[in-house]
Amino acid sequence: MIFKQFFDNTSSTYTYLISSGKGREALIIDPVLENVETYIGYLKELDLKLVKVIDTHIHADHISGMAELRDKTNCVTIMGDKAPANVVAMKVADNESIKIENINIKALFTPGHTSESFCFLMNDRVFTGDTLLIKGTGRTDFQNGDARDAYNSIFNVLLKLPEDTKVYPAHDYKGETVSTIGEEKKLNPRLQVKSVDEYVNIMNNLNLPNPKMMDIAVPGNLNLGISLEKQKLSNGLEKKDFLMKIKDQNSLLIDLREKQEIEKDGKIEGGLEIPFTEINEYIKNNKAELLNKNLFFYCRVGHRSALAVQISKTYNLENSHHLIGGIKNLNL
């Protein structure tokens, strides 16, 4: 397995790249915009294909690199299901899985630092975002943070993991790179409290200044999605036109979501189910047949389908359209 930890000196942010090996698919957690070219250089060096990128929460101290990575690599952007509506292409709920090839990552809903914070568990390690830091915990005094929720997320979710589980946070300010659940139980000063009220009292009296980038980073990270206007420019169709045109005999309807999304949100009957991460290969292998078809893509909120139209055009498949706003726009 390839596991690479990157560090951003400006925001003290850790970014993680995961892959099962050279020439395989890759996933990135908590990328920083200014370091996107570094990530891409590493991907090229090891012949890796970036297919998914995750943010643990809406960051307040840096602009996320998710959108830039999406635009440069056609990867799927992912956050937990409490994130604002159209920030990312795919959302995962508590205990749902994110998969790339033989790697399985479990989403854990851990509100407290922010109301939408998630951690992500992969075998022997957990990516804790700003929820649990090394010998510290994430502040809870902005972005709908809540110290009581944070206590529950830490003590009743993260600290229930095996003690040898490695802890990889989104930040560190003292040069630490990794810890374990067992070490944090023993050595983290904020975890030595005797009650939730004691923890809440500590967190509510930190009196820290707001992050320097907060007024720029939060609005920026809330607008990472592909806007409806941009979706329209990518041969986007409003739902009435879309539902009418897919009835044509020469049309081919393609659902770009993953199986768990389809099971959760329903689907339009009669289409192919091809996850977005496989659509380039599908088009390449079936180009001759598809040249005579009108392609109609859809996904959850229109991000992946807009990108699928762009991919189709690289194969000269000009009769490609997609559903603006995705299946969420259909209110099934």
Indicate where each model-derived feature is located.
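Catalytic cysteine-centered active loop of the rhodanese-like fold, especially the PTP/DSP P-loop
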Residues: 108, 274, 283-332
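Positively charged, proline/Ser/Thr-rich regional signature most characteristic
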Residues: 226-295, 328
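Histidine-centered catalytic micro-motifs
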Residues: 53-63, 110-115, 167-174, 301
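Active-site metal-binding loops of divalent metal-dependent hydrolases
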Residues: 31, 58, 82-83, 113-114, ...
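Core dinuclear metal-dependent hydrolase active-site scaffold
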Residues: 17, 97-122, 160
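Conserved beta-strand hairpin/beta-sheet module of binuclear metal-dependent hydrolase folds
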Residues: 1-49, 119-129, 135, 258
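Accessory terminal helices/loops
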Residues: 152-166, 170-251, 259
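Active-site HxH/HxHxD metal-binding segment of metal-dependent hydrolases
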Residues: 12, 23-26, 33-109
